[in-house]
């Protein structure tokens, strides 16, 4: 199974494509799509959309896994992240790829085994599970890979129970 994990952000959108086969993870590609704060928001969203569309076309994931919104006191931030999630989901759906959403708690639980794990613990497990030399930077990239790993673990468990996604 090939999964594209996305950590949505307007300035930095983290992405990571992971192959999961025979209970082993292989990182295919990972990185960040960045936009400049001085540019019109509509163009920034378009840049992120086109970047994701290109990644999906090139690496052909079967699934897109994206982090769900979490509560933030800054309503402007929540709205902007919601817009980025919207274009991310649209890029996947327009490419015929199924989308799954996971809360930060679900991601931590799946990757570390503890839903209240610290960010550093999650990043370290991403490094270990993907057999990487170092923790991917920026943090958004490690977070995106964690979301992809979360889907693989969740799907694997459901398949064992006979409820494969």
UniProtKB/Swiss-Prot annotation:
Mg(2+) 2 binds at residue 67. Coiled coil: none annotated. Signal peptide: none annotated. Pfam families: RuvC. Mg(2+) 1 binds at residues 7, 140. It catalyses: Endonucleolytic cleavage at a junction such as a reciprocal single-stranded crossover between two homologous DNA duplexes (Holliday junction). GO terms for cellular component: cytoplasm; Holliday junction resolvase complex. The keyword DNA-binding applies. The keyword Iron-sulfur does not apply. Its cofactor is Mg(2+). PROSITE patterns: RUVC. It is found in: Cytoplasm. Its EC number is 3.1.21.10. GO terms for biological process: DNA recombination; DNA repair. Keywords: Cytoplasm, DNA damage, DNA recombination, DNA repair, DNA-binding, Endonuclease, Hydrolase, Magnesium, Metal-binding, Nuclease. Belongs to the RuvC family. The RuvA-RuvB-RuvC complex processes Holliday junction (HJ) DNA during genetic recombination and DNA repair. Endonuclease that resolves HJ intermediates. Cleaves cruciform DNA by making single-stranded nicks across the HJ at symmetrical positions within the homologous arms, yielding a 5'-phosphate and a 3'-hydroxyl group; requires a central core of homology in the junction. The consensus cleavage sequence is 5'-(A/T)TT(C/G)-3'. Cleavage occurs on the 3'-side of the TT dinucleotide at the point of strand exchange. Homodimer which binds Holliday junction (HJ) DNA. The HJ becomes 2-fold symmetrical on binding to RuvC with unstacked arms; it has a different conformation from HJ DNA in complex with RuvA. In the full resolvosome a probable DNA-RuvA(4)-RuvB(12)-RuvC(2) complex forms which resolves the HJ. This is Crossover junction endodeoxyribonuclease RuvC. It comes from Caldanaerobacter subterraneus subsp. tengcongensis (strain DSM 15242 / JCM 11007 / NBRC 100824 / MB4). The gene is ruvC.
